[in-house]
Amino acid sequence: MELPLGSDLARLVRVWRALVDHRLKPLELTQTHWVTLHNIYHLPPGQSQIQLAKAIGIEQPSLVRTLDQLEEKGLITRHVCAHDRRAKRIMLTESAEPIIQAVNGVISHTRNEVLFGITPEQVDELALLVARLEKNILALHENQA
């Protein structure tokens, strides 16, 4: 009998996300907020919503609700692009910096706890395997298109 690898990976993502959501609750943020802020922080300033959605790997409409929430919290601003009035550029606010640092601390601490007893070499090997699985899946999608 084959192992249900897809189910195992999906379950791992769910429990990891639930743990991160629980730990970010005191900051009134979620894992989705963190992923979005993390990408905005690490991408060049003034990314469009479309570019950000691509970087995260989601559809733009899925991103809009999260951006609305982050804007309500005063962590980002959105401005109409001068070259394309349909596009919006996303910028972090000054108040986002300490929040991002706090979130990064929570994420780093959580990651260290989750990886307890696992060597850096094992983590590297897992990352390579996950990347290979993703590459194989993307190739299968391309072949079906």
UniProtKB/Swiss-Prot annotation:
Q: Which GO terms describe its biological process?
A: response to stress
Q: Which InterPro entries does the annotation name? A: HTH_MarR-typ, MarR/SlyA-like, Tscrpt_reg_MarR-type_CS, Tscrpt_reg_SlyA, WH-like_DNA-bd_sf, WH_DNA-bd_sf
Indicate yes or no for the key word Nucleotide-binding: no
* Residue ranges occupied by any HTH marR-type domain in the UniProt entry: 2-135
Q: What is this protein called?
A: Transcriptional regulator SlyA
**What is the documented function of this protein?**
Transcription regulator that can specifically activate or repress expression of target genes.
Instruction: Tell me which family the UniProt entry assigns to this protein.
Output: Belongs to the SlyA family.
Q: Which residues bind DNA?
A: 49-72
Q: How does it assemble?
A: Homodimer.
Q: Which UniProt keywords apply?
A: Activator, DNA-binding, Repressor, Transcription, Transcription regulation
* One Pfam family here: MarR
Answer yes or no on keyword Repressor: yes
Q: Name one GO molecular function term.
A: DNA-binding transcription factor activity
